[in-house]
Amino acid sequence: MARDEKTIFLFDVDGTLSESRAKMPEKMGKMLESLRRKVRIGFVGGSDLAKQKEQVGDNILEIFDYGFPENGVSFYKNGTLESQEKIIDVLGEEFYKEFANFVLRYLSDIDLPIKRGNFIEYRNSMINISPIGRNCSREERMKFFELDKKEKFREKMVTAMRDRFKDSCLVFSIGGQISIDCFPKGWDKTYCLRHIKKEGVENVYFFGDMTMEGGNDYEIYNHKDVHGISVGNPDDTYRKVDQALKKIGLGGLEEN
C-alpha cells in the first residue's frame, strides 16, 4: 500500500513518545519506522532540538519527515532547517528584563523543600520557568510534581503572571512536570500548523499528554483542523496510533 501523503501523525515528545525527560523506548522507535511507511510523521515540542535529541536520539531528524522544536518556531524538513524565529524580537529587551525580574522575585517567595538551578530558561520560542529549577534530579522532579498537584504552585504562579502582564502578548501554560511555558499568543504548538499547511497535508492527527485546559498540548489538541488524541504514556500512544491507523483504513502497525 502506498503511503498516504495527505495525512500526518504529529507527536508531542515528553510524556508521549517517552516518559518525562527519559529516553524513548525501543518499541516506540520501531513504531515510528512502521508508521512512516503509511503516513507522514512529525514531532512538535516546546524544548529545543538538543533536549529532544536526548530523549529520541541524535538521529531524530532522520526518523521524522518534519521536526518542530520549540513549537515549530524552528522548522526542519527532511533533516534541514527551513526557518527559525526568536521571541526576543517580539518582546524586546526592556520587556523581557521586566518580566524576568518579576519571575525571579516571585520564585524567591515560593517555599519549597528544595530548590536547584536553572529557574528561567530562555529559548527561541518561549521562556520556560521552573519553581524547583530544571537542574533537579529525576527523583526530585517526581517529588515536586506530586507536591505541585496538592499545593498548585505552578497554577498560582500562572494566575499571578496573567494578572501582572495582562496587557502583554504573553500566554502562559503549565508544561510537563516542573515548568511553565511563557510565549507570545499564537506561539503554542499550533504554530507548527502554518508550516504543515504549506506541505499539502489535509489530515493532521496529533498525539499528546498535556491536553487538559492549561496544559501545553491543549491548543493544538482542540484546534479545528486537527484530530486530537490524548494519551497517558508511550504505551498508550502505541495503542492509540494502532487504533487510529485502523480507523482510517491503513491497517495496524504490524500490517505493512
Curated annotation (Swiss-Prot):
Keywords: Cytoplasm, Isomerase, Magnesium, Metal-binding. GO terms for molecular function: metal ion binding; phosphomannomutase activity. Alpha-D-mannose 1-phosphate binds at R21, R123, R134, R141, S179, D181. SUPFAM superfamilies: HAD-like. InterPro entries: HAD-like_sf, HAD-SF_hydro_IIB, HAD_sf, PMM, PMM_cap. Its main location: cytoplasm. It is found in: Cytoplasm. GO terms for cellular component: cytosol. Pfam families: PMM. Mg(2+) binds at D12, D14, D209. Involved in the synthesis of the GDP-mannose and dolichol-phosphate-mannose required for a number of critical mannosyl transfer reactions. Homodimer. This is Phosphomannomutase. The gene is SEC53.
